[in-house]
Amino acid sequence: MPGSVFALMDAAKGRARAAGLGVIDLSIGSSDQPPPEAALEALREATRDPATYRYPLFSDTAPLREAAAAYLAGRFGVRVDVEREVLPLIGAQEGLAHLLLAVTDPGDTLLLPDPCYPPYLGAVAVAGLRVVTLPLLPERGFLPDLDAVPADVRPRVLLLNYPNNPTSAVADAAFFREAAAWCRARGTLLVHDHPYAELTFGAYRAPSALEAGLEGVVELHSLSKTHHMGGFRVGYAAGDAGALAALARVKGAVDFHPYLGIQKAAAVTLGLPDELGRAGARVFEARRDALVPALRDLGWEVALPQASMYAWARVPGLTDSVAFAVRAAETTGVAVSPGRAFGERGEGFVRFALVQPPEVLVEAARRLGTVSRDLPADLARQLA
C-alpha cells in the first residue's frame, strides 16, 4: 500500500506542475536546511586526503564511535563501550533493515506501531517477519498500550520511534523504562529509532531508550534530520552488545562502513556545541507555530508538536486520505502525505513536513481550504 500511494502522489505532483500550478511539496520529510559548516569543511579536507580513498575497516571507525559515545554520555548520561556497544551505519534505515536480519529468523513476530514510518514495512518484509500491530491512538498520546498485547504473542522485536513519524508524538523516560522492562520480561529486543533526538521545541528534550539500560535495547541514531545530512547516509547503532555483534556480522557481508570522509564529517558534527543544534530546531519550531494555527482555522484537529519535523492533522469528515491528498495536489499544488500511507490507523489524517518557510506553510493551508473531499470515481477504481 505505501508504495502505491506514494506513486499516486508523485503522479499527482507531476500533473500539478504540468498544469502550471506552483507546487508546495510538504509530503517528504527531507530537511531543507544546510549541514553544519564544520561538517562540510571536514568533508572537503577529507576528499583531498588520499588516505580516505581506501575501504574503511572497523578499526577506521574508531573516531566516529568515540564521538557517538561522547555524545550519548553528554546528552543522555548513557555510557557505552566504544568497541562493543556502538556501531556506525550507512544511515539508520540501512541499520534497521540489517539489524532485523541479524537478530530474527523468518516467521518471528515483530510488534509494529500503526501508523508508522513506511520503510519499516519493507525492512520487516525482507526479514520475513510476522507483524502484530500496536495501535497508536490520539487518546493515548499516540503511545502503544503494551498491556493490551495478547499473552500468547511472543515477539522477538518491539520497534518504537519517538519523537514519532508521522504523528510527532513524544515519549518520556518513564515510558521507555516501562517498555524496556516489558521487553526484558519476554525476551524481546527493544529497537528504538531516534532520528529526531535534537529536533525538539521549547523546554522539551527527547530522552533516549538507552537510559533504561543497554541490555536488550538497541537505539538507532541518524544525522539526516537533526543535522540536515540526509544525503551523507551516516548514523550509528548503540546498545546491547550481542545484538550489535550480530548486526556487525551481517554488515560485514554487505558493506565496508561509510566513506571515511563522511565519517570524519559526522564525528565533527557530533562534537559541535549544543546551541548550534538548538538553533536549527528553532527554524522548525517557527514553522510549526505558523502552520498549526492556520490549519486550526480550517477546523482541522492538530496538536502542537513538541518535536520532529511534522504536523499530524485530522481532517473532519475525511474517510479517504489518499483521495484527499491526490485531489489537493492536483487542484492546489499542495502535496501532503495521506495518513493511510502510514497504516490503517492513519486514515482520516494527513501529514505535513515542515520543510518550507512559515509564509509558504500559511499559503499551503490557505489553498487546502478550497479542496473538496469527494472521491473521484476514477481514483476509486485505481485504489480498488
Task: Locate each region found by the language model.
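Conserved core of the PLP fold type I
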Residues: 52-181, 198-199, 204-213, 377-383
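Conserved core segment of the aminotransferase class I/II
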Residues: 210, 214-285, 372-373
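Helix C-cap/helix->beta junction micro-motif
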Residues: 16-19, 127, 185-186, 298, ...
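N-terminal small-domain helix-loop-helix segment of the aminotransferase-like
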Residues: 2-91, 98, 269-272, 285, ...
